[in-house]
């Protein structure tokens, strides 16, 4: 099972709240067999502890440490929100990465996302990508 599959990418989405964005990221992972139904509630638990907004229009919601048992396969969902969504404290997210990692694979996933998002040009490419293949290509450049 691929960590980032085409089915895990939702382009050009419109959501009305941070909660809706997190739910969509989690539901995408559920629908494609990466996590159990309970994972979304663990994502919200994690968000209550501290915001998963990373700056530069990027948010990376994920489950709590206890949520590891809900992860069936390591994976990423990418929700592209070109118009942005209020993500708390005046921050706007335009790309939301839902992540789930078996064992410690989430650290590798986070590392790849951090490398990609350290370049402002890559963030612009993520926000403006017109196809799932375009987004996957950005990730393949890092690996």
Curated annotation (Swiss-Prot):
InterPro entries (UniProt xref): PTrfase/Anion_transptr, PTS_EIIA_type-2_dom, Sugar_PTS
GO BP annotations, alphabetical order: phosphoenolpyruvate-dependent sugar phosphotransferase system
Active-site residues (renumbered): 62 (tele-phosphohistidine intermediate)
GO molecular function: kinase activity; protein-phosphocysteine-sugar phosphotransferase activity
Keyword Cytoplasm: yes
A Pfam family reported for this protein in Swiss-Prot or TrEMBL: PTS_EIIA_2
Subcellular location field: Cytoplasm
Gene3D superfamilies per UniProt: Mannitol-specific EII, Chain A
Listed GO CC annotations: cytoplasm; plasma membrane
Keywords assigned by UniProt, alphabetized: Cytoplasm, Kinase, Phosphoprotein, Phosphotransferase system, Sugar transport, Transferase, Transport
Modified residues (Phosphohistidine): 62
Domain named PTS EIIA type-2: residues: 2-142
UniProt modified residues of type Phosphoserine: 74
UniProt remark on domains: The PTS EIIA type-2 domain is phosphorylated by phospho-HPr on a histidyl residue. Then, it transfers the phosphoryl group to the PTS EIIB type-2 domain.
Function: The phosphoenolpyruvate-dependent sugar phosphotransferase system (sugar PTS), a major carbohydrate active transport system, catalyzes the phosphorylation of incoming sugar substrates concomitantly with their translocation across the cell membrane. The enzyme II CmtAB PTS system is involved in D-mannitol transport.
The protein's name: Mannitol-specific phosphotransferase enzyme IIA component
Native source organism of the sequence: Bacillus subtilis (strain 168)
Organism phylogeny: Bacteria, Bacillati, Bacillota, Bacilli, Bacillales
